[in-house]
């Protein structure tokens, strides 16, 4: 078992490269992400780059992941991001000074283990932020306008 426990909030792009370099030497059969949304997004990005190589920025946008990645098991310890069930990983790109997304059905976890007991040790402030995040996602999903299917569209904003 190889443990990478240096995940930072909003997953800085360059930290993914450090994780992947360590993991490649280990040659894992699967990736398990345990933690909040950033930990799960890091796990998705690690599974992607271990499987397909290249640079993370090669996959920005939608449908650029060429095929299945290493199996991913997602174990959320906060409630709010929904990363354990979405086809999206969000990272911070210092060159763009913004968050960017990678979206592909190949990023969906093979299994999500959602145990509410794991959220019980979260600090109250983090629990409140995660709850607000969940509410924001729900409102956004309900009110968002439909958009075209152009895969480059997310990168044009």
Residue positions per predicted region:
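An N-terminal, well-structured beta->alpha segment
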Residues: 1-4, 21
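Short beta->alpha junction loops
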Residues: 3-13
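Glycine/threonine-rich beta-strand-loop-alpha-helix active-site module
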Residues: 14-117
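Carboxylate- and glycine-rich phosphate/diphosphate-binding segment that chelates Mg2+/Mn2+
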Residues: 88-157
């Amino acid at each position: 078992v190889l443990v990478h426990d240096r995940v930072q909030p909003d997953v800085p792009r360059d930290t993914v490269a450090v994780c992947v370099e360590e993991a490649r030497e280990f040659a894992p059969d699967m990736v398990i992400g345990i933690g909040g949304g950033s930990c799960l997004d890091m796990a998705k990005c690690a599974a992607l780059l271990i499987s397909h190589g290249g640079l993370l920025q090669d996959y920005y946008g939608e449908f650029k992941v060429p095929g299945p990645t290493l199996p991913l098991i997602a174990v959320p310890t906060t409630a709010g991001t929904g990363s354990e069930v979405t086809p999206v990983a969000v990272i911070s790109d210092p060159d763009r000074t913004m968050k960017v997304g990678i979206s592909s059905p190949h990023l969906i976890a093979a299994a999500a283990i959602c145990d509410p007991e794991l959220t019980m040790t979260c600090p109250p402030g983090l629990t409140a932020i995660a709850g607000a995040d969940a509410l924001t996602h729900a409102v956004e999903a309900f009110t968002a306008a439909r958009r075209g299917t152009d895969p480059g569209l997310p990168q044009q904003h």
